[in-house]
Amino acid sequence: GVWGQGAGESSWQLKGLVDTYHAFRSEKPNDWMSSRTRLRGEVGKNFAGSSLFVSFNATYNALLKERTGFELREAYLDHRQEHWGFRLGRQLVIWGAADGVRITDLVSPMDMTEFLAQDYDDIRMPVNALRFFVFNDKIKLELLAVPTFEGYKLPTDAANPWSVLPKETP
């Protein structure tokens, strides 16, 4: 068990990582495209067919100052029985993604603020949702309620090297 707990008892799981990413444009105007450092933390607890999960990012972004700060990424309760279950809270909803092609994976919006400078998994944005599952060995049915709309984030600030708007040229 974790921290001296016996098998079958509830336990806490702690995980995390630190990563840093920097990109410099080698052609004119020879500027920084991205410069950020992130601490990602994950905390989970399992107990009696249920689990709690929380993940967060603490980020320093040297170029996009408004992106510096703390972000609660996911925070949900997951419960499973033999043939049904539910997940309630802030979560990533991923349906049918395959190597960067999003055919049915359209529930969680994307943060395109630093489009090519982030991993595909990191540009997905969590949604507040209730997911209800019914399943057996042959089929899984999922009902989803997302009470609040959250759309894609597009880089529109002219100071952002990834801006979708045309830059004014002198």
Language model features with spans:
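Short intrinsically disordered, low-complexity coil segments enriched in acidic
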Residues: G1-G4, L143
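Outer-membrane beta-barrel domain signature
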Residues: W3-A7, S26-W32, A62-K65, A117-D119
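Short catalytic helix/loop segments, enriched in acidic residues and glycine
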Residues: W32-G44
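Outer membrane beta-barrel
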Residues: G44-W162
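Surface-exposed beta-loop-beta
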Residues: N160-P170
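Transmembrane beta-strand segments of Gram-negative outer membrane beta-barrel proteins
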Residues: G6-S26, S35, S50-V54
